[in-house]
From Swiss-Prot:
Subcellular location: Mitochondrion
Coiled coil: none
EC class name: transferase
Gene Ontology terms for molecular function: succinyl-CoA:3-oxo-acid CoA-transferase activity
Function: Key enzyme for ketone body catabolism. Transfers the CoA moiety from succinate to acetoacetate. Formation of the enzyme-CoA intermediate proceeds via an unstable anhydride species formed between the carboxylate groups of the enzyme and substrate.
Active site per UniProt: 340
Cystines in this chain: none
Name of the coding gene: Scot
Swiss-Prot/TrEMBL catalytic activity: a 3-oxo acid + succinyl-CoA = a 3-oxoacyl-CoA + succinate
Name of the protein in question: Succinyl-CoA:3-ketoacid-coenzyme A transferase, mitochondrial
Length: 516
């Protein structure tokens, strides 16, 4: 039952009574009190065809699954969905994409959703790929009333130069391409102008709310949910628990209620981990299986990468070999690992009983955190990155060039992954960029070239390249310098397998390996 205010009272008395009235709420029946709605169906009832909607979450962590299902049930069509990821085929935004309810996706990574990629390449869906940090800032700025901003991310790539395929025709030709963006120089560095996003609706998922709309998120499920709360005409939060006013300490509130228009309590959440990774207890009675050749190769690269870590360093590691390198950080060395989805202080993979779907890394893998770790939203995460506060970033590549160009996010018309946070990471001032990769493609062709043939992730951004065969440094005006050669290879081998000219260091040495 709803409590009602009556009578003519002083302002102070009215305020006190208002708080008591709001605290006396019921979620039973069709009625709602202030911001509290009965259900997802009730909360999304006024969403019309053609709406632009921000969908919180990262992969399938922290997604507003009840509202997504309500939109499916309601049958809203022609949605422009703004989401960091396209979810997977049967979860997250993928639910609406599969039903052909989404006409356009604005996001940074789509590689895990095969149906999204199919619709995009076959001309059924428009996709505007946007660097993850730029997307977070477009949303943050939109919520702060800032119409546009400048960022170093994406300069001299398709993001800035235009020409990125947004929509294909049925016959596979590019029907709509991205437009060229303005550039301005500040202190000798080029910056790209990006317009902000302010949507019709923002659908977010939180752990707790009070009737005023104050929100608390759980661990890494804060991600894009936090900035999206601020950047829409109507923000709806689905939560696992609604607590009375005053139950949340002001210090623990992550998003103030001023940004939230509607809340409802969801039930029976289907929380999943997209990539379950666990640490298996070692059985000393069972010998470890012999490593396969691919594993030996990866570990050789990872053990060389680990020599670049130093005590007190902040590092961001891409998926695959970069993450593997963290296994070789020397005991006693303190390296804080940053993850774009909002974690500082990543730990090892959890044991089976410690898996938490609200605690994943940027590769959507289950993780733990170390003592002293912290959680934050995606906008804060990329402020750390873009601001140059991360000392080193280690990424994979499809191609690299002799001048330090990097290509690792798409093959036009064939492979669509998205750039994720890579463009932001490599554009950060003062951050050392190391590329780890196999020296050659599966067909034997070189991946180190004079000029990249694929769309760039960054121009002139690489500082070091580490493969299973060699280590190169990259310097402006100098190009590639071979500084180390792996055991079993010669300089002639490196020349034969590299598609770019390079200088051999006078101090050339055998490739280093951190002891194990």
């Amino acid at each position: 039952m709803l409590c009602r205010l009556v009578g003519n009272r002083s302002l102070g008395a009215r305020y006190t009574a208002s708080i008591k009235a709001i605290a006396c709420y019921s979620t039973s029946g069709k009625q709602r009190n202030g911001k509290i709605y009965e259900s997802a169906i009730d909360a999304v009832a006024d969403v019309q065809d053609g709406a632009q909607i921000l969908f919180g979450g990262f992969g399938i962590c922290g997604i507003p699954e009840k509202m997504i299902n309500a939109l499916k049930q309601k049958g809203v069509k022609n949605i422009t969905g703004v989401s960091n990821n396209g979810g997977v085929d049967d979860t997250g935004l993928g639910v609406l994409i599969k039903q052909k309810q989404v006409s356009k996706v604005i996001g940074s990574y789509v590689g895990e959703n095969t149906e999204l990629v199919r619709q995009y390449l076959e001309g059924e869906l428009a996709v505007e790929l946007t660097p993850q940090g730029t997307l977070a800032e477009k949303i943050r700025a939109g919520g702060a009333g800032i119409p546009a901003f400048y960022t170093p991310t994406g300069y001299a790539t398709l993001v800035q130069e235009g020409g990125a395929p947004i929509k294909y025709s049925k016959d596979g030709k590019v029907e709509i391409s991205s437009e060229k963006k303005p550039v301005k120089e500040f202190n000798g560095k080029n910056y790209v102008m990006e317009e902000s996003i302010f949507a019709d609706f923002a659908f977010v998922k939180a752990q707790k709310a009070d009737p005023l709309g104050n929100l608390v998120f759980n661990k890494a499920a804060r991600n894009f949910n936090a900035p999206m709360c601020r950047a829409a005409k109507i923000t709806v939060a689905e939560v696992e628990e609604i607590v009375p006013i005053g139950a949340l300490s002001p210090d623990e509130i992550h998003v103030p209620g001023i940004y939230i228009n509607r809340i409802f309590k969801g039930t029976n959440y289907n929380k999943r981990v997209e990539r379950l990774r666990i640490t298996e207890p070692k059985d000393p009675s069972k010998p470890a299986p012999p490593p396969n050749p691919a594993q030996v190769l990866r570990e050789r690269i990872a053990r060389r990468v680990a020599l670049e870590f130093h005590d007190g360093m902040y590092a961001n590691l891409g998926i695959g070999i970069p993450v593997l390198s963290s296994n070789y950080i020397p005991k006693g060395m303190n390296v804080m690992l940053q993850s774009e989805n909002g974690i500082l202080g990543l730990g090892p993979f959890p044991t089976k009983d410690k898996v938490d779907p609200d605690l994943i890394n940027a590769g959507k893998e289950s993780v733990t955190v170390v003592p002293g770790a912290s959680y934050f939203g995606s906008d804060d995460s990329f402020a750390m990155i873009r601001g140059g506060h991360v000392d080193i970033t280690i990424l994979g590549a499809m191609e690299v060039s002799a001048t330090g160009d990097l290509a690792n996010w798409m093959i036009p018309g064939k492979l669509v992954k998205g750039m994720g946070g890579a463009m932001d990471l490599v554009a950060a001032p003062g951050t050392k960029v190391i590329i780890t990769m196999e020296h050659n493609a599966r067909d034997g062709s070189p991946k180190i070239l004079d000029t990249c043939s694929l769309p760039l992730t960054g121009k002139g951004v690489i500082d070091m390249i580490i493969s299973e065969k060699a280590v190169f440094t990259v310097e402006k005006g100098v190009g590639l310098t071979l500084i180390e050669v792996a055991e079993g290879y010669t300089v002639d081998d490196i020349i034969a397998s590299t598609g770019a000219k390079f200088t051999v260091s006078p101090n050339l040495k055998k490739m280093g390996q951190i002891p194990v």
